[in-house]
A protein has these predicted regions:
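Enzymes that bind and transform nitrogen-containing heteroaromatic metabolites
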Residues: 1-165
Length: 165
């Protein structure tokens, strides 16, 4: 099994605000789909609830939701109590962890790959991406190499890929 993490963050690390994502970036959504399609995704309950209903469950992916609420059932997803339970349930597949902040913190020590979209906006937030210390993580790709793409929404962004050293 391999554990990969994926998130979009502002330049100062914000990934969430008020239970949602503080930007709309179709290019990031397309990349997320391309990377995770056909693989299981693991998320916390709040992340699940932040998804628009029409995307619950995320199509083409086994959806696993972490929740401390005993007996919680969500249509189209499997609910487990912990990240360890999720990984045991999923077996040998590549698993994508997609949030939120607490789940990223739990999964980061197990991860071998992180895919990041850096969004060039300043936003207020209440949830941050974990740090990727340079002695533990190596950037393997940046698109573009220098500077930013401009999204269809006039938002600057770039894609970064990291692997564990």
């Amino acid at each position: 099994m391999s554990v990969s993490l994926i998130w979009a963050r502002s330049a100062d690390g914000v990934i969430g605000s008020g239970g949602g994502i503080p930007w709309h970036l179709p290019e990031d959504q397309a990349r997320f789909r391309a990377l995770t399609f056909g693989h299981p995704v693991v998320m916390g309950r709040s992340t699940w609830e932040s998804l628009p209903e029409r995307f619950r469950p995320l199509p083409g992916r086994r959806n696993v939701v972490l929740s401390r609420t005993v007996g919680l059932e969500v249509a189209g997803a499997e609910v487990v109590a912990s990240l360890a339970d999720a990984l045991a349930l999923l077996g040998d597949d590549e698993v994508w962890v997609m949030g939120g902040g607490e789940v990223y913190a739990q999964a980061l020590p197990l991860a071998t790959r992180v895919e990041v979209t850096v969004v060039g906006v300043a936003v207020e937030g209440d949830t941050w991406a974990p740090d990727l210390p340079g002695d533990e993580w190596r950037e393997t790709a940046s698109d573009p190499v220098d500077g930013w793409h401009m999204s269809s929404q006039d938002v600057p962004y770039r894609f970064e890929s990291y692997v564990r050293r």
